[in-house]
Design a protein with these regions (language model features):
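Active-site neighborhoods and metal-handling regions in enzymes and metal-associated proteins
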Residues: 1-327
């Protein structure tokens, strides 16, 4: 049936628009249709002679959110924020990570959300140093930091939040120092989110703060420029500072334009800002730093006047987190 319809409709058209590479069977089907039409060329049937990948066109449209989409993303971000707050208030040493995951899901479902936007990460202690840890089955020990990366999906629109907080409600001195470094890196990145800046500037701003911090802690040696050029910082910070957000958690859209320059930020774009620090056990690292894993992630909307943090209802300063956990 489909073959009959397509073979009737596409003759005489110059171009077929198609998302190339997403489904190899559909790719082959289109090639077969064109081949069949070309075989009828002597009968005056004109086959399309171009196939254009529609991905770039559709992805560019998805970069700028409509008012409806922004409203959905605000609501999704609020629900995810409430879920993170619930986990902070619920946690106790000697619980298991999956118990916090259950609290996250409880909040999602009580707000009408049937599923998370992605597999939630509930990582206590050294588990937080594994970027995509999803086992969520370890016991939470007194003194652990807990990294939760969790978001929900509302009407197809994703939220994506990470918070890192102490299992016992109080950051230690070392945890405080590293946490503040990551928070300062995020603050520096947020200052670069406006229509005056391009995509990579928030990452560059966050990375500068982190590199300086790694030097101060003795984790990296040399000048900021040397550490950047050699990539020595990647032992402790190995990912980018953000990604597009929307219908997918890592949403569609290029990060550079056709001239290979970073895209300028525009009103309606939505992205994450998520610097981190991950210190695995190593003979090169002071033992008191081992197993510290911290990430702070917010969802951000670019506006005419700057930006709006959509996930602002979940606390992230040391004082505000400790105050919430003490309630």
């Amino acid at each position: 049936m489909l073959d009959e319809i397509v073979l009737k409709e596409i003759p005489g058209h110059q171009k077929i628009y198609h998302r190339i590479g997403q489904d190899i069977l559909i790719d082959q089907k289109i090639n077969d249709w064109i081949k069949q039409l070309r075989e009828k060329g002597r009968a005056g049937v004109r086959a399309p002679h171009e196939i254009e990948d529609i991905s770039y066109i559709a992805d560019e449209m998805r970069l700028i959110k409509s008012d409806f989409e922004i409203d959905m993303m605000r609501r999704s971000a609020k629900i995810a924020s409430l879920a993170h707050n619930r986990a902070m208030k619920f946690v106790k040493p000697h619980m298991y990570e999956y118990e916090l995951e259950a609290e996250i899901m409880h909040e999602f479902m009580s707000q009408g959300i049937r599923s998370p936007a992605y597999q939630s990460i509930i990582a206590a202690g050294g588990n937080a140093c594994t970027l995509h840890y999803i086992n969520n089955n370890s016991e939470i020990k007194d003194g652990d930091l807990i990294l939760i990366d969790a978001g929900c999906e509302l009407e197809g629109y994703a939220s994506d939040i990470t918070r890192t907080f102490p299992a016992n409600g109080k950051y230690t001195k070392i945890q405080t120092d590293f946490y503040q470094m990551v928070l300062d890196a995020q603050s520096a990145a947020l200052k670069m989110i406006s229509t005056k800046h391009h995509w990579n500037e928030p990452h560059e701003a966050a990375l500068s703060v982190l590199i300086d911090g790694f030097r101060d802690f003795g984790l990296c040696q040399g000048s900021r420029e040397e550490i950047y050029e050699t990539g020595a910082y990647k032992e402790f910070y190995m990912h980018r500072t953000g990604h597009w957000l929307g219908l997918d958690v890592h949403d569609a859209g290029e990060y550079k334009n056709v001239s290979k320059e970073w895209k300028q930020l525009k009103p309606g774009m939505t992205l994450t800002v998520e610097p981190g620090c991950y210190i695995r056990p190593s003979s090169k690292v002071p033992k008191e730093f081992w197993n510290i894993g911290i990430r702070i992630e917010d969802d951000v909307l670019v506006t005419q006047d700057g930006h709006e943090v959509l996930t602002k209802e979940s606390p992230k300063t040391i004082e505000s987190i400790e105050a919430l956990m003490a309630k």
